[in-house]
Amino acid sequence: MHDKIKMDSSWEGRVFPLALIVSFGFMFFYVSLGFLGVIPSLEPGAVIGEASRWCERVSTSMFREPVNALSNLGFMITGLLMFWVLSKDVRSADSNQFHGLTPISMLYAGAAIYLGPGSMLMHGTHTDWGQWADNLSMVMY
């Protein structure tokens, strides 16, 4: 018979809302800076309307590669779904590390979420720091 551990500590109930707030906060911050004209930039050699190194034409909008940038919302949604499912999961005392909110499951879900903003910064800005954020997110995953 498996012993069940009900997750009812106060911090476990806050993990999903915190991940949701951080994700929406990033999007709000990015879009706000985009409307203010702070974020969009161009890498040297890139020409508006020409295909970039990642097969999408470079745009003048706040997202230099709109499809590549916005498709990264899928990673954010997937990571948020992971946090939601994990926060509702009943953990067995002898279960593996991906049942419930364990350090490894939270790290994995957090890395999945960060893949979205990291890649979005690269495809959205075409800057060196955006490329750095993208590389960091892939290494973290």
Question: Predicted segment positions?
Answer:
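Early transmembrane hairpin module of multi-pass membrane proteins
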Residues: H2-Y141
